[in-house]
Swiss-Prot record:
This is HTH-type transcriptional activator RhaS. Residues 174-272 form the HTH araC/xylS-type domain. The gene is rhaS. NCBIfam families: PRK13503.1 (NF010028). The record marks D241, D250 as: Interaction with sigma-70. Binds DNA as a dimer. The keyword Transcription applies. Keywords: Activator, Cytoplasm, DNA-binding, Repeat, Rhamnose metabolism, Transcription, Transcription regulation. InterPro entries: AraC-bd, AraC_XylS_family_regulators, Homeodomain-like_sf, HTH-like, HTH_AraC, HTH_AraC-typ_CS, RhaR_RhaS-like_N, RmlC-like_jellyroll. Residues 191-212, 239-262 bind DNA. One of its GO terms (molecular function) is sequence-specific DNA binding. Activates expression of the rhaBAD and rhaT operons.
Length: 278
């Protein structure tokens, strides 16, 4: 597995923060690093396989990666990321207690993926741009300024994450997308889902199309197919079992949709004919 080292990304040995844009981020094999990072998805879509679990990521997704986590990107489509790198929560010169603002693992569950709405994403970009402008300066005031900006970024993300902000339709849509990640295999009635998240069906369609470029059903089908592709690569379950586990009641229909989406059959993926990078 590839290991990325801080010496190749941080501008100096005492820099606590570094900005690493990926515009775009291509498919990238599984790796880990000796630093931590906050991955901010600007726009586009892709699959982020994090510690073996696939997540669909789109504009507004924020992922917190620790130095012992392993992850990869696949099936990227114009996926643009900004990575905010930091050595460790306790390696800042002017800040202490940052762990309290970061996601915490509880009972083996780590809430690594958050979502923010478009207006918050704009504020995030402004903070990151300010940090980036100061990267070449190593004097104490500049270091303190970068660390203060990093603290502001953490506060903004925490206050604006879907866990703490459900006041507008954009935030409720983000919660809906997170719900689909956990319930993609369920039979989905869009009228009922819209009601569940206090959205009109028209608003759900419009905002989901704006955020992902797909209609709700098309997004759900792609999510199911991506989960199925991951299982084909990383499990021994039969194609039929995988189809059912991912929400398809007809394995033939599943195979047709799968080939249409990926230009490969499920059997091709199982046999590694697509040349996927391990």
């Amino acid at each position: 597995m590839t290991v990325l080292h801080s010496v190749d990304f941080f501008p100096s040995g005492n820099a606590s923060v570094a900005i690493e844009p990926r515009l775009p981020q291509a498919d990238f094999p599984e790796h880990h690093h000796d630093f931590h990072e906050i991955v901010i998805v600007e726009h586009g879509t892709g699959i982020h396989v994090f510690n073996g679990q696939p997540y669909t990521i789109t504009g507004g997704t924020v992922c917190f990666v620790r130095d012992h986590d392993r992850h990869l990107y696949e099936h990227t489509d114009n996926l643009c990321l900004t990575n905010v790198l930091y050595r460790s929560p306790d390696r800042f010169q002017f800040l202490a207690g940052l762990n309290q603002l970061l996601p915490q693992e509880q009972d083996g569950q780590y809430p690594s993926h958050w979502r923010v709405n478009h207006s918050v994403l704009q504020q995030v970009r402004q903070l990151v741009a300010q940090m980036e402008q100061q990267e070449g300066e190593n004097d104490l005031p500049s270091t303190a300024s970068r660390e203060i900006l990093f603290m502001q970024l953490l506060l903004l993300l925490r206050k604006s994450s879907l866990q703490e902000n459900l006041e507008n339709s954009a935030s409720r849509l983000n919660l809906l997308l997170a719900w689909l990640e956990d319930h993609f295999a369920d039979e989905v009635n869009w009228d009922a889902v819209a009601d569940q998240f206090s959205l009109s069906l028209r608003t759900l369609h419009r905002q989901l199309k704006q955020q992902t470029g797909l209609t709700p059903q098309r997004y759900l089908n792609r999510l199911r197919l991506m989960k199925a592709r991951h299982l084909l690569r990383h499990s021994e379950a039969s194609v039929t079992d995988i189809a059912y586990r991912c929400g398809f009641s007809d394995s033939n229909h599943f195979s047709t949709l799968f080939r249409r989406e990926f230009n490969w059959s499920p059997r091709d993926i199982r046999q590694g004919r697509d040349g996927f990078l391990q």
